[in-house]
Amino acid sequence: MRCIGISNRDFVEGVSGGSWVDIVLEHGSCVTTMAKNKPTLDFELIKTEAKQPATLRKYCIEAKLTNTTTDSRCPTQGEPTLNEEQDKRFVCKHSMVDRGWGNGCGLFGKGGIVTCAMFTCKKNMEGKIVQPENLEYTVVITPHSGEEHAVGNDTGKHGKEVKITPQSSITEAELTGYGTVTMECSPRTGLDFNEMVLLQMEDKAWLVHRQWFLDLPLPWLPGADTQGSNWIQKETLVTFKNPHAKKQDVVVLGSQEGAMHTALTGATEIQMSSGNLLFTGHLKCRLRMDKLQLKGMSYSMCTGKFKIVKEIAETQHGTIVIRVQYEGDGSPCKIPFEIMDLEKRHVLGRLITVNPIVTEKDSPVNIEAEPPFGDSYIIIGVEPGQLKLDWFKKGSSIGQMFETTMRGAKRMAILGDTAWDFGSLGGVFTSIGKALHQVFGAIYGAAFSGVSWTMKILIGVIITWIGMNSRSTSLSVSLVLVGIVTLYLGVMVQADSGCVVSWKNKELKCGSGIFVTDNVHTWTEQYKFQPESPSKLASAIQKAHEEGICGIRSVTRLENLMWKQITSELNHILSENEVKLTIMTGDIKGIMQVGKRSLRPQPTELRYSWKTWGKAKMLSTELHNQTFLIDGPETAECPNTNRAWNSLEVEDYGFGVFTTNIWLRLREKQDVFCDSKLMSAAIKDNRAVHADMGYWIESALNDTWKIEKASFIEVKSCHWPKSHTLWSNGVLESEMVIPKNFAGPVSQHNNRPGYYTQTAGPWHLGKLEMDFDFCEGTTVVVTEDCGNRGPSLRTTTASGKLITEWCCRSCTLPPLRYRGEDGCWYGMEIRPLKEKEENLVSSLVTAGHGQIDNFSLGILGMALFLEEMLRTRVGTKHAILLVAVSFVTLITGNMSFRDLGRVMVMVGATMTDDIGMGVTYLALLAAFRVRPTFAAGLLLRKLTSKELMMTTIGIVLLSQSSIPETILELTDALALGMMVLKMVRNMEKYQLAVTIMAILCVPNAVILQNAWKVSCTILAVVSVSPLLLTSSQQKADWIPLALTIKGLNPTAIFLTTLSRTSKKRAGVLWDVPSPPPVGKAELEDGAYRIKQKGILGYSQIGAGVYKEGTFHTMWHVTRGAVLMHKGKRIEPSWADVKKDLISYGGGWKLEGEWKEGEEVQVLALEPGKNPRAVQTKPGLFRTNTGTIGAVSLDFSPGTSGSPIVDKKGKVVGLYGNGVVTRSGAYVSAIAQTEKSIEDNPEIEDDIFRKRRLTIMDLHPGAGKTKRYLPAIVREAIKRGLRTLILAPTRVVAAEMEEALRGLPIRYQTPAIRAEHTGREIVDLMCHATFTMRLLSPIRVPNYNLIIMDEAHFTDPASIAARGYISTRVEMGEAAGIFMTATPPGSRDPFPQSNAPIMDEEREIPERSWNSGHEWVTDFKGKTVWFVPSIKTGNDIAACLRKNGKRVIQLSRKTFDSEYVKTRTNDWDFVVTTDISEMGANFKAERVIDPRRCMKPVILTDGEERVILAGPMPVTHSSAAQRRGRIGRNPRNENDQYIYMGEPLENDEDCAHWKEAKMLLDNINTPEGIIPSIFEPEREKVDAIDGEYRLRGEARKTFVDLMRRGDLPVWLAYKVAAEGINYADRRWCFDGTRNNQILEENVEVEIWTKEGERKKLKPRWLDARIYSDPLALKEFKEFAAGRK
């Protein structure tokens, strides 16, 4: 039981039935392994030492000088000399001084002087080299025996000490009584000793980089030197002062020890003991457990009594240790031990000490176990003397999970690549225990500050990913975990970014931790280079041009693309700064050539204004005669030697909407190496890969490593960096198949026996595949008499003839071949057998030899594959929104451009897909380690929004500024994350501000500093003001406000929904719980208290009302949490944060409404008191949506949600959402909303079948648009049916949009502004739009389902649309649904309604009146008055206004613009023509309907013309629709319908029917059939099909006249049929005398386009064009040619 006392401890569970498990041991930590039917063992690595390291070099850090001697000479007397100059121990210096008569010389001039001093070293330091084979590891193994002294002890009786060295890596340890355990260890120091030196100074040692050590500017001796006196570079510690005539002072610098200590800051310090160095190595061991056995498996259970010897002790690992003593008989025996929940129904927790046994009576035994969170009983022994101990464990499984994940991730980051052994990669996948131990291993104590941004992303990704994908097998989860974290370690080439190899797609992907994979080979589409700052780049180019650099050579294809994209922008910047220079970018062909110069970053940037930015996007600049050439062919004016090359390096990765952006910056210093940030190298099993954005070089192990194949998208000329090269020691450059100067890695993997470096391969092709196989149709033989190596040759000649026979001297088969776009080429060793080489196409390339370099870093950037990580795509809508939000944050200066990319990643990429189901698993994950789980079969249920929080925690981790220490610190950040999530999905105006605020506050989410607090608070207050604001936070705190400022604790509510029950069932990965099913709670109607479990037990947080199966309360009380009642749950189903209301288990059912002036009672359920009823008369709150009642009563916090009832006992609202007045009193609003109709009506399956035409005749107000339509559309989308929805007017279309919001629909009407992705399968438009589309030549999609709302509309376009739809349905091409309360043929003018309507017949005035008709104006409520024509309407409206009424007038022409005004409350009358029959919703209490209308009728006696006949009675269906404008609100019980006269079905003579036929005859169906009118309407018209068909131009004119000219159908038809074209308006003036149009009894004259003044008398007369002033005005404009 050694591990119990060690804080850093991991538990590894072996896979059941497995005979081995992998563990990683490290210093200061302890590993406990558990496997089925095996003893629990503790392993600890107690030391790693290096024996006798060899010395590499000694440095002197403190010296002294003795025996100083000087000699000097006068001018012309030669050089002075001293004997000491020959002695290696002396340091000497010659110099010249001025001499003359004053100091003993005859001549004036320079004379020589020499000074020597003896150099002895007082203090030195040594650099030593450690050989990995000299390391020795000591491990202690102890079984959990439970004996008295076992805890934290390792005496010989209990423990075995095992020494492990690289020479003997397999060791066996005999554990007395438990069998033997075999350990196969591969020691890893985690250090590359080839590159590291141990610097030893007195009794301290540091690990330093070898090159740094060798470059130290100090005197040194080689390690082999034994005398220790002949120091090299002595002068580095000695200073000679300026010489005087005969003397020169020499001084020694002080001790360099302090300087060395400063320089070594940050280097790893190494402990020493007795000349041996102690390391912090890791040991990766595989334990073979097959020879282990549990002690005492055959013993029987103990039946006697136990007593507790010592209090239960809690360890720091969440486990407990119990010490018991057996007082019964029958030892040795097994101890019965279990942990139960409080009801003693379920066994929870787990035993760490497997099979605890008593060996002898009265000797104490230690048992270690892991109880669940919360309360539990620990039961030891059997009845009668059973011990029952109550235990409470702090914390929560979710908190635990985050802690563990974070620790796992931290630890992965530290363990580095030592954790993975690529030789036996299979091991990782087969022993899942190991992967878990690695990633989720418990605490890693090392100080681990400053976790990089990427790391946070990764932790977030791990969590989020598991949340999204746990449906897959446990295997893939562990794989991905391993993958991500390793990815972070091995591939993070530089700090925050890295690349990963995808084996499947043979490609490398780069980014900062969130990898977006897409199975596209082409980098060009996924990645985009961008300069860090165009203006900096332009300034560097300007400077380079001044220095004589004439151009640039790109290193890679992507760089060339980047130059092409930004050329215009750079030119604009140059011209804004008046630099007379034009940049021109050319293409690249073949090899990417090398330039010899480089661009250097300049301290100043050029000016770059918004205007220029805008211009650069649109216009091109003028050309100057000085040019700067980028790529393109080499020219004499600009040779490669004078071009800059390799001057850019990757600075960061960011995510665009569709591509990964790679930001480039200028390099400080130039070299020949490729940029390593876009590279990776990896080994897996027997394959090795070197890859970057254009290369994929694959080698395989087949006895020896050989290069197998390589793909090149480009051939570049930089050198492959060593840091990304596998196995680079001992490489002969002449044997590297891919030449070093074409970026061939200097690696043993880059060779193939029998082939030498391919300096003259066909690299000029640029894009080629290299592998080992025969070119098609050729043979290769190995023979001595073959030609020598030469440039590669193509197997086809220039004329296309195939050369079939080839040979080589000593190559290996299959031969090396290249496949390019022009055919197949062989390697340089392979020559033609018979053909002369001159006749063949040979390679144009010769690659020179660089320097041979046989030594390299052994750093291996490892990569595990990480496929489909996050499969989301940002939709354009969200992208635009994000840009807006981010832009504001940028302007306010709270964010830099680099952060911007990160915010994009955080909010955009991870959230745009509805996160949906997968998240549940996250919550389950928490339950994996410890049993309590969600109280429902979550996997089968749909989620509630609160549970989404789990993912949010994962996502918020991304934005954290430091990894939070405790889970509670996460909560503010969590709330913000939650808001951002919500905002991006559905935005309202007030939310935008809150979101911006949230993003602004994120960087300091953990500790909001005061300044932040203030700015966030102000912002919050401004953005929250739309409804009610409270300053007493307890009663109603606006969630964003409260969470931002106070950091309330939303997780707390959530945690109460975790219950503690679960069945035990072992799973592969963690123990996956199977939760017992939980039913839906059933409550009786009444008021309830809502309690929350806190640290001190339950406390009341509010109240609520249960009615008709729905529970109602305030949103701020529960914030959407799931409620529990007697172990069953109720889930939220509707909420409105603005009104602060939420309902559970159904829509809002409280229907009482407070009437102004009535008294009410508040039934106050205060915490800790009995309910009491307080009667009061409410005041008024005025808000921008109207007035609401205000109750001035102040109860204690926790009363929110108490019901307010009226005299009839109906609940009129809830208490608790209000404001504090100036005097400090609290005033609550009566919070109430409309009763909701259950919104998922049953929908028959067969309405979606083709050939099926359904008529839904629901009464007005039954919810066709609000309830049935969304349900039908959702089902249609689910079935993938191409659907069309038709609305009669734009207004109804806009109402539909409200009901259908959130569904993917393309709105084809200007009334609705919405974003479209192009993937929607549902279209929505107006009846007339659809008919016009059918008439025009555009192809109308083949809709599978067409839904027509208000299908009683008798406009010609609507009738025609019905005809077309019914024809499509009859042909079996589609299904149709006609929604109307009054389908054609219905005869009931008084249909059913939601609320009772008082119908009353009385005399209704038909024109203005002076007296009488008081009932019209005395009515208190709002009235809708139907009038037969616009003229009558104007008359009546004027009369009503005279009587002081506020009137809104509606007609077909004004409907779209005026209808909006009826939404406000400031009107008394709406005066409307029959257009309002089409689904217009007025919140009115009365309809006045004279049941009269004007009808257009075609007169055929004499000259054919259209008159407006009437007023005449309306049809039954019109009457029913008019009456249906009221009676819609179930709460209004006294709506009135005032009518006059009876309706009449006599509309056959109406012009609309014939006009509809004119339209139908001109509609094309794909099958060429002319559609006929819908059957029930057919007898209204007697025309023959096709009678009105127009040909070619005439039809186009017909459509134009209706669409652009706004003419009635009949008139348009007459004009078009005559063959007149659209622009010709002469027909408006050449009619007969009778057709003269009058306005107020005056003949109308107008000015034509030609400037003549003519009388308006059209050739065909249609009364509709002059029946009212507006229509006439429009026709005059038409006739004048202005349309």
From Swiss-Prot:
Residues 1411-1582 form the Helicase C-terminal domain. The record marks A495, D496, A847, G848, R1065, A1066 as: Cleavage. Residues 467-472, 941-946, 1011, 1059-1683 are cytoplasmic. Residues 1249-1252 are annotated as: Important for RNA-binding. It catalyses: Selective hydrolysis of -Xaa-Xaa-|-Yaa- bonds in which each of the Xaa can be either Arg or Lys and Yaa can be either Ser or Ala; a ribonucleoside 5'-triphosphate + H2O = a ribonucleoside 5'-diphosphate + phosphate + H(+); ATP + H2O = ADP + phosphate + H(+). GO terms for molecular function: ATP binding; ATP hydrolysis activity; double-stranded RNA binding; protein dimerization activity; RNA helicase activity; serine-type peptidase activity. Glycans are attached at N67, N153, N702. Residues 98-111 are annotated as: Fusion peptide. The chain crosses the membrane at residues 446-466, 473-493, 916-940, 947-965, 990-1010, 1012-1030, 1038-1058. Residues 1066-1243 form the Peptidase S7 domain. SUPFAM superfamilies: E set domains, P-loop containing nucleoside triphosphate hydrolases, Trypsin-like serine proteases, Viral glycoprotein, central and dimerisation domains. Keywords: ATP-binding, Capsid protein, Clathrin-mediated endocytosis of virus by host, Cleavage on pair of basic residues, Disulfide bond, Fusion of virus membrane with host endosomal membrane, Fusion of virus membrane with host membrane, Glycoprotein, Host endoplasmic reticulum, Host membrane, Host-virus interaction, Hydrolase, Inhibition of host innate immune response by virus, Membrane, Nucleotide-binding, Protease, Secreted, Serine protease, Suppressor of RNA silencing, Transmembrane, Transmembrane helix, Viral attachment to host cell, Viral envelope protein, Viral immunoevasion, Viral nucleoprotein, Viral penetration into host cytoplasm, Virion, Virus endocytosis by host, Virus entry into host cell, Zinc. Serine protease subunit NS2B: Required cofactor for the serine protease function of NS3. May have membrane-destabilizing activity and form viroporins. This is Genome polyprotein.
